[in-house]
Design a protein with these regions (language model features):
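Acidic, glycine-rich loop-and-strand cores that form catalytic or ligand-binding grooves
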Residues: 133-187
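Functional-site microenvironments in short loops/helix caps that host divalent-cation chemistry
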Residues: 1-152
């Protein structure tokens, strides 16, 4: 998935669910006005021993939620140990036909590069500059030709409080200091 598509998908979710917290508990029921409520659920991110199970590698087969078609919902997935016993069961989210759109695994995303400069003491400007590109012919993992600088990403880790946003609705964090249930609710 390209960054541009991921960004559009995220903002569609935010508008439809009226929340920045995509991992809020899933609720299939509409509110009294007919609007979506809740979020897509924690998905597989709440598995307590994911690292011990397989070192954080993906383990949900692609297409597990296909029964939902282009809909939105969750489908249970039993995580099976080598001996055949069930380790736990996770809920796999699907949003408008896209399986695990947010928060499943670290993902490679074309159309965005971050240039991380050394700190000022080390001869740089100390910034992490976000560059984006919407032309697949110009996608690059290391270059910036055809990319536009859209803002500076937060250098510190923490929960996202503000995103770059700008003219393109960028979703990369510019400020941390939020929480797991406040602001954007995602850890950077």
């Amino acid at each position: 998935m390209t960054y541009d598509i991921l960004k559009e998908l995220y903002w569609l979710f935010v508008i439809e669910y009226a929340t920045l917290n995509s991992q809020a508990t899933f609720n299939a029921e509409k509110d009294s006005n007919g609007y979506a409520q809740g979020g897509l659920g924690a998905g597989v991110t709440n598995m307590s021993d994911w690292s011990g199970f397989n070192g954080y590698y993906p383990f949900v087969p692609c297409g597990h939620t296909d029964e939902l078609g282009n809909g939105t919902g969750e489908v249970a997935y039993p995580v099976i140990n080598e001996d055949g016993s069930t380790r736990c069961t996770v809920m796999v989210p699907r949003y408008r036909g896209v399986e695990n759109p947010f928060g499943h695994v670290w993902q490679w995303t074309d159309g965005i590069n971050i240039r991380i400069s050394p700190t000022e003491e080390n001869g740089g400007d100390g910034l992490s500059k976000e560059f984006v590109c919407t032309d697949p012919a110009k996608f690059s993992d290391s270059g910036y030709d055809g990319y536009a600088h859209v803002g500076n990403e937060a250098r510190a880790e923490g929960y996202v409080k503000e995103v770059i946003f700008g003219e393109g609705g960028e979703i990369m964090p510019s400020v941390v200091g939020g929480g797991s249930s406040t602001y954007f609710c995602d850890y950077h």
